[in-house]
């Protein structure tokens, strides 16, 4: 996906995909860039993950103000995307730096959340693919995901679905941690999965931060 395609897609109110040499705009659902004003709607999606699952290791639901600040901080460097169905936000995806040290600039940690009433309908793939295309245009080489997984078998708080989803997206398992996170009084494993977006070469050009890509 070219930088011009990213700019045009977002300017037209929906992300565009680069397919078979031509740019085609998505029909419903639509994907757009988030703003801090989206915080209440996106927090409503996130809240059940905090209260009812071990998918996120966060214990307390952040305030709307804190969540808006997270969006704003992300957008200073990276894409933060919102998926809508009939004008209603039903999912969001963003990335953060894998590490604050400059040598890690080519690698990001990904996060993706869908409203629980629209999961398992293929929307996660579309949202992830849109995020991936933005990162490719930026010059990011590595998408990394830190995923909570059950230590033994699935339970009411956590399944292997997230790990399976990322495997279907092309990620490979690159690391695992034994019972390193506790939530709801239970211990869970964590795993790192990685998707390589571009060849890593000596003197790799620095990524273009997302706001500069849209300028």
Residue ranges with predicted function:
Residues 29, 88-92, 188:
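Glycine-rich phosphate/pyrophosphate-binding loop shared by adenosine-nucleotide-utilizing enzymes
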Residues 30-42:
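A short beta-loop-alpha structural element at the N-terminal edge
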Residues 43-70:
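Conserved GNAT-fold acetyl-CoA-binding loop/helix
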Residues 120-136, 160-164, 168:
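Conserved acetyl-CoA-binding loop-helix of GNAT-fold acetyltransferases
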Residues 179-215:
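C-terminal "cap" of GNAT-fold acetyltransferases
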